[in-house]
Regions:
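Iron-sulfur-associated redox domains of electron-transfer enzymes in respiratory
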Residues: 1-148
Length: 148
């Protein structure tokens, strides 16, 4: 979120950057002083659906407009549990073939806490850890509107 927002603001300082996603924690992240200047608003899918309902907007009835996708599949997978680590592993394998990559994953706060405790004690078999607070990853966050 922040890297994309920073890139947009560098290209157009007057742009309004709105992050829309299922993750309620992004609201807290965007309120941090060093991020606030890049991200103007954070809206969950649930909040967006509420806005559509209040304004009687039915997305399925709107005219489609062409979208230019420039993101990689690896980048779009960030929000799924294991997605960040998977993207990093793909990059390492591409730029440094033959390099061993040891990754540990955790989903849910209890599992993340357990993994961090093991890492702190030196009992984790991996040198990169990825923890997703929500089981299933960000796509299954509290602000989602469909089951994942």
């Amino acid at each position: 979120m922040v890297a994309t927002a920073r890139h947009i603001k560098e290209k157009d300082p007057e742009a309004r950057v709105v992050f829309i996603g299922p993750c309620a924690a992004k609201k807290l992240e965007a309120s941090r002083t060093y991020i606030r200047s890049y991200v103007d608003f954070v809206i969950t899918f649930e909040e967006l659906a509420g806005m559509f309902d209040a304004l009687e907007i039915i997305p399925e009835e709107l005219e489609e407009s062409p979208i230019e996708f420039t993101a990689t599949g690896a980048g779009r997978g960030y929000a799924v549990a294991g997605g960040v680590a998977n993207a990093i592993e793909k990059c390492i394998n591409e730029y440094y073939p033959g390099t061993e990559v040891k990754i540990q994953h955790a989903e849910g706060l209890a599992e993340c806490k357990k993994m961090l405790t093991l890492a702190k004690a030196g009992k984790l078999n991996g040198y990169m850890i990825e923890g997703m607070g929500c089981p299933g990853g960000c796509v299954a966050g509290v602000g989602t509107i469909i089951p994942v």
